[in-house]
């Protein structure tokens, strides 16, 4: 076989294997092409895409840059380079790539959509809105476009009509692609934001029928009052929810929901931490043994690290723990159910901090008793909660899927667990559907 024919055959075999997900087969075939012709633009391009899929993003960028120097008018290559930058949060570089792709191919579907997404990530909200509208104007039957624009409208509502418009986009996305069940989750939450709870329950009922093993729609049906509310969110629900949410958790919570529980907890602990540092100057051992209980992606870690001798984190979601490992700062991270973990570690910590975790527990008696036992004498527990309005008693599962607690109930269960010096500060710690949610932070001490 002559060289040109052998090269063409190897490239075709590589591309076929690549499309079929056979990366181990495709990579050496692309490299064979490049051995025959070291400046082959398609082999450079597609090998770059493959290396990105394998987590070798820096090498991928080099190969795509080489490909684009050879074929600068290749819209797909510009778009794929933009995708790599986007996934590494280099949003300005991604924007430039997508704009070059669209200058060459104004209807390029992936570049249209991803330009809108990176403009949103860059917090250029008005430009992002226009980009989403342009995407759907050019591709009105794109289910992904309807879903993403609906998500954008819920995250950046200018008025109630935006959320109502989001509902229509979610319905449109599902009509175009009924296999995308994540659309039903977004639709249910949008309807909750509009206080159309019965409609939200109908959506969750439909979702539960389509995906009977998924715990999320079952939990949300209970949250809407259409099934009995559990005493706490099930382990399977928490894992499913947060494993799927881990990669975008920080951006969604901090940017879109105004999440500020970590700093509020540090603020409420300020007198305790100041007293500890004063004691260190008088000869006490430096630092505290601290547990971040329900640590998630580790948002509390940087705030706690400066005060810790040893900083541990525990979470039920392995996906969230992966993000916490990438963030760093913890001496130990453990995948476990929180109450059982605390029960297994008596008198192990000087301070336990729990941000946005008790909202997945209705009844708090067992958890607070376990936290009390896991503290050393004189240790403190600080946590955030969402609260019921006024003098409402007990606890309730809200249509958001999160539990809210009455102030009197919190006081009673803390006292019952043996805590003293309970201090509560009312604070709105996050938004939902554009509105601040009533909540607060609590500091309590285990007596000597």
Residue map of PLM features:
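Conserved alpha-helical positions within TPR/SEL1-like repeat arrays
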Residues: 11-19, 42-53, 76-87, 110-121, ...
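Class I SAM-dependent methyltransferase SAM/SAH-binding core
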Residues: 291, 295-341
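Short, glycine-/aromatic-enriched active-site segment of Class I SAM-dependent methyltransferases
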Residues: 383-403
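A conserved beta-strand element that flanks and buttresses the S-adenosyl-L-methionine
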Residues: 353
């Amino acid at each position: 076989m002559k060289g040109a024919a052998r090269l063409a055959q190897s490239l075709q075999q590589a591309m076929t294997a690549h499309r079929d997900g056979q990366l181990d087969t495709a990579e050496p075939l692309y490299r064979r092409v490049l051995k025959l012709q070291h400046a082959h633009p398609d082999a450079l391009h597609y090998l770059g895409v493959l290396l990105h899929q394998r987590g070798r993003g820096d090498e991928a960028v080099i190969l795509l840059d080489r490909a684009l120097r050879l074929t600068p008018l290749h819209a797909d290559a510009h778009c794929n380079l933009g995708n790599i930058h986007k996934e590494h949060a280099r949003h300005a570089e991604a924007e430039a790539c997508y704009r070059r792709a669209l200058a060459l191919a104004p209807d390029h579907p992936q570049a249209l959509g991803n330009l809108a997404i990176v403009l949103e990530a860059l917090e250029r909200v008005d430009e992002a809105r226009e980009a989403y509208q342009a995407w759907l104007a050019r591709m009105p039957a794109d289910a992904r476009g309807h879903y993403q624009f609906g998500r954008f409208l819920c995250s950046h509502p200018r008025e109630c009509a935006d959320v109502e418009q989001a509902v229509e986009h979610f319905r449109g996305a599902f009509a175009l692609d009924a296999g995308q069940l994540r659309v039903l989750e977004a639709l249910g939450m949008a309807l909750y934001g509009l206080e159309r709870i019965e409609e939200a329950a109908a959506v969750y009922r439909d979702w539960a029928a389509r995906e009977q093993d998924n715990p999320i729609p079952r939990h949300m049906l209970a949250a809407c009052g259409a099934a009995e509310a559990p005493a706490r969110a099930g382990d399977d629900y928490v894992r499913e929810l947060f494993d799927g949410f881990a990669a975008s958790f920080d951006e969604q919570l901090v940017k879109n929901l105004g999440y500020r529980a970590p700093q509020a907890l540090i603020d409420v602990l300020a007198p305790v931490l100041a007293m500890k540092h004063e004691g260190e100057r008088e000869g006490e051992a430096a630092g505290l043994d601290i547990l971040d209980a329900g640590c998630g992606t580790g948002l509390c870690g940087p705030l706690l690290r400066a005060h810790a001798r040893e900083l541990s984190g525990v979470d039920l979601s392995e996906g969230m723990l992966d993000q916490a490992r990438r963030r760093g700062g913890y001496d130990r991270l453990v995948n476990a159910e929180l109450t059982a973990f605390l029960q297994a570690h008596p008198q192990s910590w000087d301070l336990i901090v729990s941000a946005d975790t008790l909202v997945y527990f209705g009844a708090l008696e067992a958890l607070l008793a376990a936290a009390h036992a896991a503290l050393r004498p004189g240790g403190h527990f600080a946590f955030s909660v969402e609260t019921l309005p006024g003098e409402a008693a007990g606890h309730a599962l809200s249509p958001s899927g999160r539990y809210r607690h009455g102030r009197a109930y919190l006081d009673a269960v803390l006292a019952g667990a043996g805590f003293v010096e309970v201090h509560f500060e009312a604070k709105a710690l996050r938004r939902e559907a554009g509105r601040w949610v009533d909540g607060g932070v609590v500091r309590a001490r285990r007596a000597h």
